[in-house]
Design a protein with these regions (language model features):
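DG-centered beta-turn motif at the end of beta-strands
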Residues: 8-19, 35
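Glycine-rich, charged/polar anion/phosphate-binding loops
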Residues: 24-27, 85-92, 303, 355-361, ...
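Active-site glycine- and acidic-residue-rich loops that bind
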Residues: 17-22, 78-87, 351-358, 365, ...
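Hydrophobic/aromatic ligand-binding patch that stacks against planar heteroaromatic rings
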Residues: 30-32, 64, 93, 272-273, ...
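Thiamine diphosphate
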Residues: 1-11, 22, 26, 41-172, 242, 246, 312-314, ...
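A short alpha/beta connector and helix-capping loop motif
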Residues: 21-42, 302, 306, 455-460, ...
Length: 538
C-alpha cells in the first residue's frame, strides 16, 4: 500500500479539440461519479486543424468539465512556475480527496498541424502566438532566479545532446523483418485442450443463463481481481435476464456494479482495468447497443497487444446477449457477429448450450486476450420450442473448453447421399429440428467459436459428406457465414458434390417488431428442411 501522499494518480493529457468527442463526456461522467483519482490536462491552443474554437465549441474546457461536477483550474500554460504549482496543488487534492480535477491550460499553437497543412494558409494569429512562446519566457524566469546565461546555454545544449543521442540510437536500431508483421496479434494462451467433467452424474439440467451465472460466481470466488459491470447488473436487478442475479449481494458493490448507458466506457475501460491487473467482465445489455462501443473495441482493445509488441494485452470478457427473441424489434434483436469478426485482435465465442457457455467463459477468463461472448437470449431459458437441449447438466467447476474447438452436435457415419450443416447459436436448433425430417442424412457441426475457427473439423466434415449448408441467424449477404462458405468452397472444392449453400435471415435493414414479420424474416426448422431437400437432390 502506498504511503499517504504518494497514492497513484492517472494523468490524462489531451487537446481542446478532442474534448467535444462524446467519449470524453462518458469519461468525465464516470470519473466524477466514481470519484476516480484522475488529473485531466487540457492543452488549449484554440485550434482543431483549421477550425477555430469559437466555431466549434459552445463553451471552453473549464465550463464543460464543471457540468460533470469536476473541479477545474484555468492557467496560462506558458507560465512555468504557475503551471508547476497548480499541477502540484491538484495532485495533492486528488490524493487527499480521491476525486478528479481538470486543468485547463491555455497555450499557443507554434507550428504547422502537419507538413502538408501549413499554418500560414488559414491563420491570422501567428504573431500573437509567437509572442506567447513559453521558451523565451522560461529563460527570462531562470535569469530572474539567479541562473547565469552560461548555465542556461548549458541546459539547452544538454537537452539537444539528449535528443540527438536518442535520435541516433533510433536510427541505428535494427529494422523489423517482414516476419515481424505477424507477431503479437494475440498473447499466447495456456488453454489448449478441453478439461474437466462436462456432464457430472446425479445432476439435473440447468438453464443456459444459470450456467453463465454459476461460472462467473466461481471465478469471482477464486479471483479477487475479477470485476463485473454493465447496465443493470447491480444489486437491484442482477441483469435484465437475471444473468448476474445475487452476484452483487455476494461480492459487494465495489466488484459488481451498474454503469450508465455508456457502451464506449464499458468497453474502453477494460483497457485500464487490465493494465493495473484487474480482470473485467463487462456486459453490453443487447447486441444492438454495441455500436457506440465499437470505436473503443476496434481502436484500443483489439490493438493494444499488437501495438505494444506484446506488452499490454487487454485481458477482458465482453458479454453480449444477442439474437431475435419474442418480438424484440429492431433495437433488441440484432446479430452483430459479422462486424465483430472483422476486428482482428479479439476472440469471439457464440455457444449454443449451457455447458459450452460455462466452459468458454472459464476459458475466456484465463485467456490474456480480449474475448467477446455472444449469448443468444432465446436460449437463456429454452422457452422457444425446440431449444430444450440448450439446457444441460452444469459442468464441473474445472470444466474448460479451448477456443477454436467445435462440437459435433449430430454425428452421421453414413456418407451415402448425406450432407452436413455448419452452424452456431440458434442455428443449431433449427438444424436439429430440421434433421428430424431427414433421418440418417445429416451431420451437424456447432463451431462454438467464430474466432478462432475450428477449420479442421469444418473442412473434414464437409469433405466427408460432399454437401454442405452454412446456417446463420444474420442476413446472409456479406456475412461471416457467407465468408465461411467461400473458405469451404476453396478448401473442399475437389470433394464437393454441390455448391456450398448458405441460409440466414432475409436481407432487410432490421428485424421487425411484428411477430408475423419477424417469423417471415428469420430462418426456422421448416425453411432449413426445405433447403436440405434441395441440397440432397442436387
Amino acid at each position: 500500500k502506498p504511503k499517504k501522499g504518494e497514492e497513484s494518480v492517472v494523468v490524462c493529457s489531451f487537446g481542446d479539440a478532442s474534448i467535444t468527442e462524446g467519449e470524453v463526456a462518458e469519461a468525465f461522467q464516470m470519473a466524477s461519479l466514481k470519484k476516480l483519482p484522475i488529473l485531466y490536462i487540457v492543452q488549449d491552443n484554440e485550434w482543431d486543424i483549421s477550425a477555430h474554437a469559437s466555431e466549434m465549441r459552445a463553451v471552453d474546457a473549464t465550463h464543460y468539465a464543471k457540468g460533470f461536477g469536476l473541479k477545474t483550474y484555468t492557467i496560462d500554460g506558458t507560465d512555468f512556475i504557475n503551471s508547476y504549482k497548480t499541477i502540484n496543488k491538484a495532485l495533492k487534492e486528488i490524493r487527499n480527496k480521491r476525486s478528479p480535477i481538470l486543468i485547463h491550460a491555455k497555450v499557443p499553437l507554434l507550428n504547422h498541424h502537419t507538413s502538408g497543412v501549413r499554418m500560414e494558409w488559414y491563420r491570422d494569429d501567428l504573431e500573437e502566438a509567437n509572442n506567447r512562446d513559453p521558451f523565451p519566457k522560461l529563460k527570462n524566469i531562470l535569469l530572474q532566479n539567479k541562473f547565469t546565461k552560461e548555465e542556461i546555454i548549458n541546459i539547452e545544449e544538454s537537452a539537444r545532446q539528449t535528443v540527438y543521442s536518442d535520435y541516433e540510437r533510433a536510427i541505428k536500431a535494427e529494422d523489423p523483418t517482414p516476419e515481424d508483421l505477424f507477431t503479437h496479434d494475440f498473447a499466447p494462451t495456456k488453454i489448449l485442450k478441453e478439461e474437466g467433467e462436462r456432464s457430472p452424474k446425479d445432476k439435473e439440467p440447468t438453464v443456459m443463463v444459470d450456467s453463465a451465472l454459476f461460472a462467473i460466481k466461481e471465478l469471482m470466488s477464486e479471483h479477487p481481481e475479477c470485476l463485473l459491470y454493465g447496465q443493470d447488473v447491480g444489486k437491484r436487478l442482477g441483469g435484465v435476464f437475471r444473468e448476474a442475479a445475487t452476484l452483487a449481494d455476494t461480492f459487494g458493490d465495489n466488484r459488481v456494479f451498474n454503469t450508465p448507458i455508456q457502451e464506449a466506457f464499458i468497453i474502453g475501460s477494460t483497457v485500464g482495468m487490465s493494465a493495473v491487473g484487474l480482470k473485467p467482465i463487462v456486459e453490453v445489455q443487447f447486441a444492438d447497443y454495441i455500436w457506440p462501443g465499437l470505436n473503443q473495441l476496434f481502436t484500443e482493445v483489439s490493438r493494444s497487444n499488437y501495438l505494444s509488441n506484446g506488452k499490454w494485452p487487454v485481458s477482458c470478457i465482453i458479454r453480449v446477449p444477442i439474437g431475435a427473441y419474442g418480438s424484440g424489434g429492431p433495437y433488441h434483436s440484432s446479430s452483430v457477429e459479422s462486424v465483430l469478426s472483422q476486428i482482428n485482435g479479439i476472440k469471439i465465442a457464440y455457444p449454443s448450450t449451457g455447458a459450452d457457455l460455462k466452459g468458454l467463459i472459464k476459458s475466456a477468463y484465463y485467456d490474456p486476450n480480449p474475448v467477446v461472448i455472444l449469448e443468444h437470449k432465446g436460449l437463456y431459458w429454452s422457452k422457444i420450442k425446440g431449444t430444450s437441449k440448450a439446457k444441460t447438466i452444469e459442468p464441473s467447476k474445472d470444466y474448460i473448453i479451448p477456443f477454436g474447438k467445435g462440437r459435433v452436435v449430430l454425428e452421421n457415419k453414413n456418407t451415402d447421399d448425406t450432407m452436413c450443416i455448419i452452424t452456431y447459436g440458434m442455428g443449431v436448433y433449427w438444424a436439429l429440428n430440421a434433421a428430424n425430417n431427414h433421418k440418417e442424412k445429416i451431420e451437424i457441426i456447432d463451431i462454438r467459436t467464430i474466432f478462432p475457427l475450428d477449420e479442421k473439423l469444418v473442412f473434414d466434415t464437409v469433405n466427408k459428406h460432399g454437401k454442405c449448408l452454412v446456417l446463420t441467424e444474420e442476413p446472409y449477404n456479406n456475412s461471416f457465414a457467407q465468408a465461411l462458405s467461400a473458405r469451404i468452397q476453396k478448401h473442399c472444392f475437389e470433394n464437393l458434390d454441390a455448391p456450398v449453400f448458405g441460409m440466414g435471415s432475409e436481407n432487410m435493414p432490421a428485424i421487425p417488431l411484428n411477430s408475423t414479420l419477424e417469423h417471415t424474416m428469420l430462418p426456422n426448422a421448416e425453411k432449413v428442411s426445405d433447403m436440405i431437400k434441395e441440397i440432397l437432390a442436387y
